[in-house]
């Protein structure tokens, strides 16, 4: 095996904000205030300044780490990084977009929406998803366009697709054309699947020739080896893995940047430290477990959570008109049978409530249903009272419930759901209320927009896995 010593990266690259970054930031200004835009700009410049110089015609590489809280804007960060990379001469950006097809699709659509912006920026960016060797000529042609567009490549974090990508960059069509031009590799959720799972075992071996490597890690090494001038940027909310691996590992970061969450961000600190009252504990007997507590009927705690969600929609969407929709997420167990069971429960409850409300007060179940919602009313407004804010009356909320139930979209998000498929996109704007029931496809990285209520069954047997 031949070992090539790459030039160590020197901090002689000073990126500047150009037209594409300014245009993107102006659109992000609809979501962020002036301080938020300034923070996003400065942190993005810092990240790119530690990357290799795309204009240096030499073999070079570096690995850097970007740490951000869960759902705190990491995607916005690497989207802005992409625009800044374009403005500063990077020709190709590769995104490891998760281990599930729905995550790949989500990232591809976000990049198309935010960077290409319909067709407004199609001259500046060319987007490819999971390209193989057959794409080599198309990407070569794109690299030769006189306007020098940046090639955006999203790829599933799986050894087959990454190996295919490495083969494409090693092809005769691309290798000479790309040369030593700057390439970014953005690894989303970098601590998941990318690192070598045999690292600890290898550390006990006396001979490095006997080291073993996981398939995804090996494919990443192939890809890095195919790119003469590249920067590998790890994005994660859980950086322990990248930080604790051997500093000799090529995925060990040399620099790190900690992202600043927005002013309105709420995360673990909010829920578990500042506002612990936002957490409601499910009674032990109602905690689902596929082997040890396989519930036959929908537990009362889930019914109450559903009622709180619907009442939240009434308050936030219908009465206060602060948002156009709210979402609820339900995760029972990794077993897909459990997700299907919970989905049936929710659908049946929603349909039953809709029928009762359609019949009106003459329905024998009408008053009982209204009373059950009334019991949840104090919980639905508790945080308003805690912060000395006025809250709508129960009667005002109840008047909205019928329409909200009729406009509630319930989705089963599992891989074997043939009707939906892994790449089904949630049409968030279509309903005022969304309920997503799922297992691993609702794992980290998947964005549930306007999430207001989460119902998750934890036992001492499943807590470490789910966290």
Where are the model-predicted features located?
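Conserved C-terminal RecA-like helicase domain
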Residues: 108, 120-121, 126, 182-185, ...
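Conserved pre-motif I regulatory segment
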Residues: 33-64
